[in-house]
Amino acid sequence: VSEISDVLRKQWESLCFNEAKFLNDVGLSEPAGEKGRTALEMLWSRPTCDVNGISGGYQGEGFKTVIASKASAKVSFRLVGKQDPQKVLSSFKEYVQESLPLDCSVNFLGEKGSKATEMSLSHPAFEKARDALSQEWPKPAKFIGSGGSIPIAGYFKEILDMDSLLIGF
């Protein structure tokens, strides 16, 4: 996974982002993720492995001491840069299988994914869009990251050889 450019890093550092307040607002005392990374780096430019849901065993109110025979988890990955979804998936499967206790098994379902897409911020159209947005708002527009695996943007890049500028407000 490549590092962000110095230009982008300086843009992010110029934001009035209070990391301590942000972390407090989301219930954390320190960033959860890669050591030595800022919260914005982890939110905007780094890959993730997210456990979106876990189920298994007794789920009603009260206590039960019966050990579940089955459990499930919904897991997703945010890919960035040139990460290959099939390689990430196979690495994850290999890790899980190697970590299984004796006499346990695992099944994987829904094994689809999209390639990450990284846009060239040096493209003149991107700078023109940033300038236009900056004219409409009281502060200069900044480029941020927002994951990297938005499928349609990847298809535009792969099939049409066009970058996509995704604008959020």
Where are these regions (language model features)?
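Flexible, glycine/charged-enriched surface loops at secondary-structure junctions
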Residues: 1-3, 101-108
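Midchain, well-structured core segments that form catalytic/ion-binding scaffolds
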Residues: 1-83
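Short glycine/threonine-rich loop-to-helix capping motif typified by GTGT followed
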Residues: 7-17, 116-125, 154-159
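Zn-dependent metallopeptidase/amidohydrolase metal-coordination segment
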Residues: 45, 52-54, 63, 67-71, ...
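Hydrophobic, well-ordered secondary-structure elements that form the walls
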Residues: 75, 129, 156
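A short beta-alpha structural unit
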Residues: 77-80, 106-122
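Short amphipathic alpha-helices in soluble, non-transmembrane regions
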Residues: 88-97
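Phosphate-moiety recognition in structured ligand-binding domains
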Residues: 129-130, 147
